Amino acid sequence: MGFFDLSIPYNEPPRSGGKEIAGGKTLRLKLATKAMELGYVGIAHNRSIKGVMSDKDSCTIPLLTLGSLIKVAPRLASSVGFHRDLLGVPRTTPFRQYTRLTVHVESNAQCQSLNSGNPILKSYDIIAVRPMNQNAFDYACEKAEVDLISIDFTDKMLFRLKHPMVKAAIQRGIYFEIKYSDILMDAQTRRQVISNAKLLVDWTRGKNLIISSGAPSVTELRGPNDVINLMFLLGLSAERARAAISKNCRNMIAKVLKKKRFHKEAVRVELLSAGDTFSLEQPLSEDCMKWDRLSSGEGDMLLDDLAKAFDATNVVAHKSSKAIDFTSVLDGLPKHGFRVKDIVGTESVTQPSAAKVIDTQVHSSNQVSELRMATASSDDNLREIETISQIDMLMSEDDNKVEPTTNVLKEEAFALRKCSASHGQGILVQNQTATPFTLTRCTKSEAASDVSMNIESTSEGGSMSPSKSDHGIPQSPVEVNNMGNAAFEEEASVDENSKERATTGHASNDEMHITESGHHASIDDEKHIPEPEHLTSIADEMKIDCSSEANHDEYMEVTMEDQMHETVQMRLCKTMTKHQD
């Protein structure tokens, strides 16, 4: 079972002659292609004329070819096969094209021209009439030799549908047509069509009723199942609606083609060429016995021919281009897929060995640790607190690149002890064994609990600018100023202590606490002053070599007000030498 659409508009050429309008031809081509894609197996190109017919109205409708359809829709064969499978239509069913003429009848003269002897009507496959008044409608139902009566239900009807006339037309084998494109218009038109067409549906009860599109554009063309659903608005059941676009159409086409090809609808008439001979003694060929009652003889398209034509157009494209072999690409991929190490690489990334800094308990930063130190002050107050910043990496002196130092430094443990005395407070820092200073331990029983801190310093040689700390990090001017003030205050305190020792003749019992180079060193005074021999032993133990001071990286010069001053270590050395004398 196949579905038909027997009303595809055809824009007629001008009366003076000529070819089809370019825009109309493109529209007809698109409509035919869309109908074929939706699963229809036959269409009729409808031409409408008004007035008196003439010889110029003979059929000149060119049927569409495979090449023209493929240009519009290259994948037409696959789409047609898909929709035909859904509709249950065999793929071997050819796509057929028919020609149709619709005559608008108003006068009696026009009605008289609708006869079987008119050569203009014989040139078309299907003859339809559209009555414009009551007389034309009655004549078409009773006497006109036509195949189809098409009624315009969009406007107010100029005649009444009489049941006897409708019944007479059905008995004569004439079919009535309803266009569903009128239902897809505005609400007013839809209401008018439904009210007028419902009467015709009730009287015919689906018998000799044909549903066609009459679509002026591609967007108004619907598939067979959609048309069946639309017919519920007119009161048609699904079976009768399906018959209106399939069975009834096929019966009407078979009838009109039989009347056109057979004499008295019994004897087949075929034209022979001048070179062909016919003999009654010879049996008829098999081609003559094979007759398709639905074929008009022209414009039939097989789906296989359509597929072959499509393949032929793509032969050159297949030769010039090579398809991607996705199977080989997928086989080359690892089963577990790509991992991060496959993309980044398996080589280990060399981490720069930099000086490690362990944060103190006071600060939460991972790179900077602050060491607070206090100088000797009054009984209950600390004189001054300074902050020394330390970082993870040391930057080389090369201007073009920065390289972290690769020397692994030994961890140095400093024990900060808060010593209390009758005259002042101080901080004791125990330095590492590699430094040139040896520090004495605090002998006070009132010493506070130890606070452990781990830092690392560099051992590489290199000159440092006066404005940098011993780790090579630039210091702010405020820090430099604080360091300079601390150095001067320390020198003053040492001079005062030496004078007191000279006048009293007693040596101080205080222990000297010296931090790493660049830090403060404080002397805590006590009541008892040791003997000069004890001071000599302390100086020998400290082993301060002033001559080798320039060769150590730990010694840093402190600048104050753009003037160079002696280092703290040199001043301590001189002070201790005077004290020994």
From Swiss-Prot:
Localization in the cell: Nucleus, Nucleolus; Nucleus; Mitochondrion
GO cellular component annotations of the record: mitochondrion; nucleolus; nucleus
Region (Disordered): 452-512
Record bears the keyword ATP-binding: no
EC number: 3.1.26.-
Skewed-composition ranges (Polar residues): 452-467
Biased composition (Basic and acidic residues): 496-512
Record-given protein name: Protein GAMETOPHYTE DEFECTIVE 1
Organism: Arabidopsis thaliana
